[in-house]
Amino acid sequence: MLSESSSFLKGVMLGSIFCALITMLGHIRIGHGNRMHHHEHHHLQAPNKEDILKISEDERMELSKSFRVYCIILVKPKDVSLWAAVKETWTKHCDKAEFFSSENVKVFESINMDTNDMWLMMRKAYKYAFDKYRDQYNWFFLARPTTFAIIENLKYFLLKKDPSQPFYLGHTIKSGDLEYVGMEGGIVLSVESMKRLNSLLNIPEKCPEQGGMIWKISEDKQLAVCLKYAGVFAENAEDADGKDVFNTKSVGLSIKEAMTYHPNQVVEGCCSDMAVTFNGLTPNQMHVMMYGVYRLRAFGHIFNDALVFLPPNGSDND
């Protein structure tokens, strides 16, 4: 009996070990599959600096004038300190920036969306922007009040992109069969994408005000569903080295992660030199970023940018 029990226990143990190995191997395959899946999405890269140098001086000046970005910032009353920081920092570099709030706020000028639902706020803001500014701006950039954006880098990234084509870009995320641009890093739509989205906003079957599921899905996923019906698909924005330029984390957190995973290349492993956005910032961090991006210079280092994007008329930006 003892030998039979012993054999039985050995069999159970061996079977358990075998099952554990199969599970581990399965996870390895699944994980690898996810990594492969991550690279199936569309990639959009910034232009090479060499290409910019080939452009004549007159063409560069025309480009700097013609690139116009309209910035949409979705805010709520609880975000008032972030709202103030965003208003005083990077939005001054947009050709025009407007704040869309969930309710009327006396402290700052904003466009009242009269709803607390983020998806409804986003829909209304996009419709307002397209109806009013479709003939004045080529690109529409939407962000949270926790996002810091370097608009000049955004313009540089978009330099060779045609706004009459349906672009929808930022930091892409895969969720089942749906690929979407995460709102944390900011969302960019060309005027053609805005046109297509606007044509669907009144068609509930294709772009419902509420998701067609029992549970609520996030506003950035809702947007992706609507745009998919319009033939507009999410594209991941990267620099020439394949690094993301729309970041869903702050610089501090990105550096902390780089110190863990790339201890010998912290700066190189952290972020792109041409980063467009960072997210998750406090009001103080907004001002620190503003100083670092637009004011701090190393003596003796000369920056020879081949193209300069002119600030909006009457702007008091840095």
Curated annotation (Swiss-Prot):
PANTHER family: BETA1,3-GALACTOSYLTRANSFERASE, C1GALT1-SPECIFIC CHAPERONE 1. Keywords: Chaperone, Disease variant, Hemolytic uremic syndrome, Membrane, Signal-anchor, Transmembrane, Transmembrane helix. It is linked to Tn polyagglutination syndrome: A clonal disorder characterized by the polyagglutination of red blood cells by naturally occurring anti-Tn antibodies following exposure of the Tn antigen on the surface of erythrocytes. Only a subset of red cells express the antigen, which can also be expressed on platelets and leukocytes. This condition may occur in healthy individuals who manifest asymptomatic anemia, leukopenia, or thrombocytopenia. However, there is also an association between the Tn antigen and leukemia or myelodysplastic disorders. Hemolytic uremic syndrome, atypical, 8, with rhizomelic short stature: An X-linked, atypical form of hemolytic uremic syndrome, characterized by microangiopathic hemolytic anemia, thrombocytopenia, renal failure and absence of episodes of enterocolitis and diarrhea. In contrast to typical hemolytic uremic syndrome, atypical forms have a poorer prognosis, with higher death rates and frequent progression to end-stage renal disease. This is C1GALT1-specific chaperone 1. Associates with core 1 beta-3-galactosyltransferase (C1GALT1), probably not with the soluble active form. The chain crosses the membrane at residues 7-26. Changing E152K: In TNPS; loss capacity to promote Tn synthase activity. Ubiquitously expressed. Abundantly expressed in salivary gland, stomach, small intestine, kidney, and testis and at intermediate levels in whole brain, cerebellum, spinal cord, thymus, spleen, trachea, lung, pancreas, ovary, and uterus. The gene is C1GALT1C1. The lineage of its organism: Eukaryota, Metazoa, Chordata, Craniata, Vertebrata. Defects in C1GALT1C1 in Ag104A cell line create a tumor-specific glycopeptidic neo-epitope. This epitope induces a high-affinity, highly specific, syngeneic monoclonal antibody. This is caused by the abolition of function of a glycosyltransferase, disrupting O-glycan Core 1 synthesis.
